[in-house]
Curated annotation (Swiss-Prot):
This is Oleosin 21.2 kDa. InterPro entries: Oleosin. The lineage of its organism: Eukaryota, Viridiplantae, Streptophyta, Embryophyta, Tracheophyta. It comes from Arabidopsis thaliana. GO terms for cellular component: membrane; monolayer-surrounded lipid storage body. The keyword Transmembrane helix applies. The keyword Acetylation applies. Residues 2-56 are annotated as: Polar.
Length: 199
């Protein structure tokens, strides 16, 4: 009796196909109801990475790694240099800062006097040309004045850059001189002691 009630499941119309066999886009079973009609095969890449991708990866990883390592070393060196230079700057700042301020103020005074002199000379020139009756129109005069002022500003900016570089060089020279100068207090103490014993 048990054999008569058994259901034969072999008459189902499933046609299983491996995703690696057959043509592209075929379904896994009859009715073509897979994922997007392509089954598992449509979800898997068709081929591996190309040779150019592998080559660029093999070249890029060491280059990027070495650049990152170099950046880390430079950052560490900068921090160490700052830690060494900051106490020296604080130690010599009573000499460097007033000297830099004095030189900067003097150069600012020279530049200001030069600009005022150029402005005065251009004003006198304009007045003399006006009194002589030079037939210039107002826009030409304004253009001339603009060019003169632009030249004066460019000259002042160039001189300012040169003076800033000069001040920086002088400050570095003073710092190097103070660092290289020997500070031996023990010999002075022995000299004064020798003088007192000789007396």
């Amino acid at each position: 009796m048990a054999d008569t009630h058994r259901v034969d499941r072999t008459d189902r119309h499933f046609q299983f196909q491996s995703p690696y066999e057959g043509g592209r886009g075929q379904g896994q079973y009859e009715g073509d109801r897979g994922y997007g009609g392509g089954g598992y095969k449509s979800m898997m890449p068709e081929s591996g990475p190309s040779s150019t991708q592998v080559l660029s990866l093999l070249i890029g990883v060491p280059v990027v790694g070495s650049l990152l390592a170099l950046a880390g070393l430079l950052l560490a060196g900068s921090v160490i240099g700052l830690m060494v230079a900051l106490p020296l700057f604080l130690l010599f700042s009573p000499v460097i800062v007033p000297a830099a301020l004095t030189i900067g103020l003097a150069m600012t005074g020279f530049l200001a006097s030069g600009m005022f002199g150029l402005t005065g000379l251009s004003s006198i020139s304009w007045v003399m040309n006006y009194l002589r009756g030079t037939r210039r129109t107002v826009p030409e005069q304004l253009e001339y004045a603009k060019r003169r002022m632009a030249d004066a500003v460019g000259y002042a900016g160039q001189k300012g850059k040169e003076m800033g570089q000069h001040v920086q060089n002088k400050a570095q020279d003073v710092k190097q001189y103070d660092i290289s100068k020997p500070h031996d207090t023990t010999t002075k103490g022995h000299e004064t002691q020798g003088r007192t014993t000789a007396a």
